[in-house]
Amino acid sequence: MKMIDPTAMSRFTALREAAGKIDRLVPHVRLMEQPPHESRDTASVALEFPTPLVVLNSTIRQALSFLFSACDTVQTDKTERGICFTFTVSRMWITEDGEQTAPPPFLS
């Protein structure tokens, strides 16, 4: 049986909160999320910024800096509206014996 890894869930929650702060503070930003689910080993939040990119104040820069440092991977995509950053937390699940369901990225 798989259980959610509390450490990974804490990291995902922190990502959601930081992304939510940016979503509230920056006009026209779109927040998307893919919460943990048994069928996936990852969970992610994404922020789509319209271009040209808005001038970001220090609070927003600090939240973005946290997002980049707290996730396992960041994917950047060009969209019709602008640019989208997807921040992902890996290895969201553990088995009953405490083993993670996926190997660390450097082993795969």
Residues covered by each model-derived region:
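Conserved short beta-strand edge segments in small beta-sheet-based binding/regulatory domains
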Residues: 33, 69-79
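Short amphipathic alpha-helices in soluble, non-transmembrane regions
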Residues: 58-67
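Short, surface-exposed beta-strand/loop "edge" segments at domain boundaries and coil↔beta transitions
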Residues: 51-58, 92-98
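C-terminal edge-of-domain segments
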Residues: 77-107
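Ser/Thr- (and often Asn-) enriched beta-sheet segments in non-cytosolic proteins
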Residues: 30, 44-48, 75, 84-90
